Amino acid sequence: MLRPIITLLCLTLMLCTAAGPAGATRIKDIARLQGVRSNQLVGYGLVVGLNGSGDSDSTAFTVRSLVNMMERLGVTVDVNDVKVDNVAAVIVTAELPAFSKTGSTIDVLVSSIGDADSLVGGSLLMTPLKGADGKIYAVAQGPLAVGALAFGGKAATVQKNHPTVGRIPGGALVEREVPFRLTPGAELHYQLTNPDFTTVTRMAQAINKHFQKTLARAEDSGSLKITIPEDQQNEPIHFIADLESLNIRPDSMARIVVNEKTGTIVMGEDVRIATVAVSHGNLNLIISENDQVSQPLPFSEGETVVVPDTSMEVSEDNGNLVVMEMGVSIGDVARALNAIGATPRDLIAIFQAIKAAGALHAELVVL
């Protein structure tokens, strides 16, 4: 009887240990090793095989590009004889991840720069992709995946999603590697994605506790310097993997992000407000206009005329007064504002007013 109980306790302890602290995040998810980053690539190319939805003849650079490409392939054509209805000039962009090797593939994004109606069904011709230094790092080619449609005639068109932008998964072949390697050394430098003094301090404490040595030291709110133990300086890969798998609980500033265009509101759990009373009413204005016919009496010299009849109705909903006490949480704020029937767009106006009153203890970001 005792053995099953001991086994159950051991399993429970293992599960609790594996789960880690509540809200914990791996170091690799909130910080990155300095120098390890992706590089942006860009190129100019042509998409062919379009069903009459390509650039018009007035797009001179598309015509010239097609003529130049044909000449490089050994075909001589006259500019005046070229039609580009099935061709579109595009800009091709991609990101070259760190440690990408020659022969590996990366995704590319293809965007029309002319007046093409759609890139559906098109194929990108061989396009060199260059970095900021002007060197070619990859070459892209292949059929596009657009995920949209656009049909129509002279009087009407039907469009779904965005047909002038497409992707080619694995469409670029890496031809040149970015020169970077982890050289044996004594120090590593990490940069936080969201700089915060509390988070970087917790990172240093977690690393020092795990390795039982004072290896990590915070340089500022966004960077951490780590000393590699002497016995692992020649092989830092295992040390980095062990370090980045550590869990910590990141901290952040209290922030409310609102988008007035879409009515979207995102609030963090640490948002607090001081004691404040909120009253919000809606003003509704209804204007209607109808044409009334004024008919003169029989045998009179009057004329029949059309007289506009305009009516206006103004109504204002009663604004309920809600008092929110100091230090209430975001859940309390949401429940209180929902109680007065506030819509997302109403909430945006309310939060701006609370911020202006000095009662919102959080950063208000308006997109």
Curated annotation (Swiss-Prot):
Residues 1-24 form the signal peptide. The keyword Zinc does not apply. InterPro entries: Flag_FlgI (IPR001782). Coiled coil: none annotated. Keywords: Bacterial flagellum, Periplasm, Signal. GO terms for cellular component: bacterial-type flagellum basal body, distal rod, P ring; outer membrane-bounded periplasmic space. One of its GO terms (biological process) is bacterial-type flagellum-dependent cell motility. One of its GO terms (molecular function) is structural molecule activity. Its main location: periplasm. Pfam families: FlgI. Assembles around the rod to form the L-ring and probably protects the motor/basal body from shearing forces during rotation. The basal body constitutes a major portion of the flagellar organelle and consists of four rings (L,P,S, and M) mounted on a central rod. Belongs to the FlgI family. This is Flagellar P-ring protein. It comes from Syntrophotalea carbinolica (strain DSM 2380 / NBRC 103641 / GraBd1).
